[in-house]
Each structure stands twice: as C-alpha cells, then as structure tokens.
Design a protein with these regions (language model features):
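Catalytic donor-sugar/metal-binding loop of nucleotide-sugar-dependent glycosyltransferases
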Residues: 114-115, 138-141, 150-168
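Short, structured coil segments at secondary-structure junctions
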Residues: 19-20, 156
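Short loop->beta transition adjacent to catalytic acidic/histidine clusters or analogous donor-positioning motifs
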Residues: 1-2, 11, 21
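A conserved acidic beta->alpha catalytic loop
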Residues: 5-13, 58
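A charged, well-structured terminal subsegment
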Residues: 196-203
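Acceptor/aglycone-binding surface of glycosyltransferases and processive sugar-polymer synthases
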Residues: 22-45, 50-52, 62-143, 169-189, ...
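Hydrophobic residues within well-ordered alpha-helices
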Residues: 16, 72, 152-154
C-alpha cells in the first residue's frame, strides 16, 4: 500500500507511517494529477507489476482488486476500470450527472474501442505499459484522472477494459455533488473531454505477444 499525501496539513502521513504503510509526503499540493504521477513513478521505481487506484471514502472494496487483476490477465488489458454500472450492485446516478456519465460512456466506448459504462470511476488498475505511460504523461486538469487518462491510454494504443464491482455506502466525508454541482459537472466535464480529445497519443512499448 502506498499513501500519497499531497501537501496535506492533517495527520494523514503520520497515521499511515504509524500503521507501517509506505508514504510519499509531497511538500506542495500538486493536485490529483501530480499526486497520481508521483505514485506511478514510485510504482515503477520499486518494480510493481500493477498499481491500483481507489477512493478513500470506503466505497471501493479492496477485495475487488483481485477481480481487476484477473480481468487484466484474461483480457490482456493495460487499464481495467472497476465499473459501478456493469451488472454488479445497485449503484445509480440521477439528473445531469447521469446524463454526463451516459454521454461520456458513449463517446469513450468508441475512443477506447470497447464497451464502457463507468468512465468516471475512481477504481482502476494499471498494468506495466500504463505505468510507463502515466509516470510521465498524466493529465493534471479537471477529470484528468478519469476521462483524460482514458483518452491518453486509447490514443497511445493501450488496451482498456472494465469489470463490474460492488460499491459500498460512503464511510466518511461529504458527497461532492448536488443538483447545482451536478449541472456544473456536466458543463465542466464536457469541456474536459474536448480538451482530452484534442491531444495526440504517446508511443509506449508494444504489448507482449501471447504464447502460441
């Protein structure tokens, strides 16, 4: 387990260290993109085969990581999304947020050349080629860790897949959306998608060939 403390001013880093967890304590707040890039660089440096991103509010079950790894192996995928809408669990969205999610799933399914139902999921597994790409090319703007990262992966010819996961009730913190914020999310996310689609891809090492 790696905890990236993105310039936090609370006791997060101290509590994690006391529990015996590896900590990257960034001196400045770099935002989600910078913190994720630091985590990817750490994963490559210490030789991780996979890195898994999940939210800290208790909604994602770490026991589902094995499901994502199995999907990466069986589908030869570089990025695996843990989807809230792929037939496992009863999570659902409403209003403008749901409209935005449906729109992005429609567009990104075509960009990634696979059916995707949850493109804004914060539960993802990254394989070796994804780690190599994102260690130096990970978007820092709004929704870069979801929509932007998927566009970069697809444009760089990485294989993206998804698998259904169970979501749990939020264990802490406040929801980041309400009707007004959801409408704003629709506008901002559409702009973020347009920016992401305007970027070229990156060259990464080819995927290993399957055994005959």
């Amino acid at each position: 387990i790696l905890v990236v403390s993105d310039g936090s001013t609370d006791a997060t880093a101290d509590i994690a260290r006391a529990a015996g967890v590896a900590v990257l304590d960034l001196p400045l707040n770099l935002g989600v993109g910078g913190a994720m890039r630091a985590g990817f660089q750490y994963a490559r440096r210490v030789g991780y085969e996979y890195a898994c991103q999940l939210d800290a509010d208790g909604q994602h079950d770490p026991r589902e990581i094995e499901t994502l790894i199995e999907t990466a192996s069986s589908e030869h995928a570089d990025v695996v999304i843990g989807s809230r809408f792929a037939g496992k669990g009863s999570y659902h969205a409403r209003g403008p947020r749901k409209w935005a999610m449906n729109l992005f799933s429609f567009i990104l399914s075509r960009v990634c050349e696979t059916r995707l139902s949850d493109t804004t999921s914060g539960f993802k597994l990254y394989g070796p080629r994804a780690l190599s790409l994102f260690a130096h090319n990970y978007p820092a703007e709004y929704l870069g860790d979801t929509i932007g990262a998927l566009v970069i992966a697809a444009r760089s010819h990485l294989v993206v897949r998804e698998v259904g996961v169970q979501m749990h009730p939020r264990a802490g913190g406040e929801p980041s959306h309400n009707p007004i914020k959801s409408a704003l999310f629709l506008v901002q996310a559409t702009m973020a998608l347009a920016v992401s689609l305007s970027r070229p891809g990156e060259k990464v090492a080819p995927a290993p060939e399957e055994n005959a």
